[in-house]
Amino acid sequence: RAAGLDVRGVMGYEGHLMMVHDRDAKREKVEAAMAILLRAHELVGGDIVSGGGTGTWDLNTWCTEIQAGSYTLMDTQYDELETPFEKALSVLATVISVSPKGWIIADCGLKALGMDHGNPSWDEGDVFFCSDEHITLMPRELSDWKVGDRVRIWPAHVDPTVARHEQFWMVEGDTIRDRWPIDLRHW
């Protein structure tokens, strides 16, 4: 230890295990990862053993602090896991074009969505393509859509999606309840 350094604990993150679907395999791998972190804790001391995440929160019984953050907003990737959490973050876009060939275009794309975990999802049909500023959607019923309609897009990864925006709009149904600024942008 360096002179004058006040160690409060250790922090690890078994991020490579978040999306393991086999619960028994995940439990075994979390235990192995935490054994390494607990050994580091023995060496440096402190009160805090920080680790875990949204994908391992219920299996990680070794940490004194769980780092789960995505659970508050969820995304389409974490939604694939069996968790008690529901998606809460979406990007609201406006339909700007309706093609008679069966698709619609809305005004959100790569610059509005975190795409590192794949395509976003849409409850009313399929996401066909995302360009920088637009998303091409294949609705189940094309006749239901017109220019100016709103579409709710569910991001595949909430963290980089949040970093692309200035504020959250808290909505309940069609009512805006509050607006929260986003401090950390462009990370």
Map each language-model feature to its residues.
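C-terminal accessory subdomain/extension
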Residues: S99-W187
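Noncatalytic linker/hinge segments flanking ATPase motor cores
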Residues: V7-H21, G46-G52, E86-T94, D107-G114, ...
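Active-site loop/helix belt of alpha/beta enzymes
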Residues: R1-T83
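Conserved active-site and cofactor/substrate-binding residues in soluble primary-metabolism enzymes
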Residues: E28, A32-I36, K87-S90, D132, ...
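Residue-level signal for the start and early helices of compact helical domains
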Residues: A2, R8, W62, E82, ...
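Generic secondary-structure boundary/loop-capping signal
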Residues: R8, E14, C63, S70, ...
